[in-house]
């Protein structure tokens, strides 16, 4: 969702550098970029309690965001995709990391190789069988059997809810 809000960011982590002279002040002021300030604050060593105190954002939500930071740190401890375990790669995808974000975490400051590294992450991920499944939204809350055209992709599943046609791409 964060990639779609038009802030020029890639998600909660692995973004361009956000320059903030006063993180406390930026956390206290609700803006359209505060979610990225929270990421920067976690990276700067702020605790969930400190961020909660400054933002009044629910600790449950902050804990979920902190887990994304922990995953980013685990990825950054690796220098190439082959060092990333299947479990870590799957966890990153479930948490919403794009292949680009994973590549950027592995590259650290060598940003000139991002396109090549992103493709390598994608190829390696697919080779390992870490691919999304198609799920169908149940618009009738399971009261009645419903066939809808409301579909989404997720890494949090094991099988597709729909059958593909013969070409393997069309539903």
Q: Where are each of the predicted segments found?
A:
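ATP-dependent carboxylate/acyl-activation modules
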Residues: 1-171
